[in-house]
Every structure is written in C-alpha cells, then in structure tokens.
Amino acid sequence: SVAGWPIAHEWKRPESYPVPASWLEAIMAGHETIEKDVALECPVLSMVSTSAYFDEEWSERAFVSDTVLDPVVIAQRSLNLSNMVTIARFPGKHDLVLSDAPVREAVYDTMLGWLAAFVK
C-alpha cells in the first residue's frame, strides 16, 4: 500500500491565489465541452470526496469534504464520459492526495488497483 508522502504545509500559501476572470471563463468553457462533446473510448476513473462543505462558518468537516466542487455533480457527470466509468469516493478533501494519510493510502491503493485492471 502507498500512503504518499508527508505533506509540507509550510510550502502552501496561507491565502489563495487571485482568480482572474479569464481563468474562470476557461474553466466554464471546459465544463461545457466536457458536458456536451466528450465521448471517450477508454475506461475512466473518477475519484471524488464523499461530501461537500460550502458553509461560510469554519468546521472540521472541511478536512473530510470537498470545499471547492460538488462531488455528487462530478460523479454524475463522470458517468457520461465513457461506457466504462469507475466512481471511487473517499472521505477526503478537494485534492484527495492532500487528505490525511489513511485517505491518501486508500486513494493510491484504488488508483493503482484500477490501473492494474484497466491499463495494459
């Protein structure tokens, strides 16, 4: 099993980067393209958090939830990407590989198992 590496929190900025309008436009255009025009002919692995947390008030739930995107929507839309889609859910953050070690281990185990099963 793989748990990844120790996370160097000191390397992460305390504040977020500014988000230019052009970046958000590109994201929205990409979402539209994926939603309407993508039909992959290969297996797809979609890994998402088990929950979302969007409240303005701080909560420990932020450590085990996606605070950026709705994992339910991601999972639903993932199903339209290909005829062979695997959805894997983990009680982790938006960036699953930055979640706590047990979640990272499960994420890597799932990813490696999926690769062994579907990628030749």
Short names for language-model regions:
Residues 55-85:
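Active-site-adjacent alpha-helix of alpha/beta-hydrolase-fold enzymes
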Residues 2, 6-9, 71, 82, ...:
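Amphipathic, alpha-helical segments enriched in basic
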Residues 6, 61, 71-74, 97-98, ...:
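Localized chelating/binding microdomains
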Residues 1-66:
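Alpha/beta-hydrolase
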Residues 76, 80-120:
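Catalytic active-site module of serine/aspartate enzymes centered on a nucleophile-bearing elbow/loop
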